[in-house]
Amino acid sequence: MNSTLQKYLPEQAVVPCFELIKTHGVHLKIVSHRVTRHGDYRRLPNGLHQVTVNASLNKYRFLITLVHEIAHLVAFETYGR
């Protein structure tokens, strides 16, 4: 996963982001360009957490979007819907 993240994130952000993904059990999907959103978070019916981020984003926008979506996951776990 680190080698994949290296293509999309600034070098210094790869390890911390990987730790966030691992800690929160995120299934990360890097998807093709969507006009209406940069990324999204959803809890799947089986209880797993899925974060999608557009592959077309620059490294810094990708980083901000990934952290933003993981924050949605943390808020969901803390406060519920």
Give each language-model segment a name:
Residues 1-64, 73-81:
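Active-site-proximal or metal-binding-adjacent scaffold patches in catalytic folds
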Residues 69:
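Walker B catalytic acidic pair
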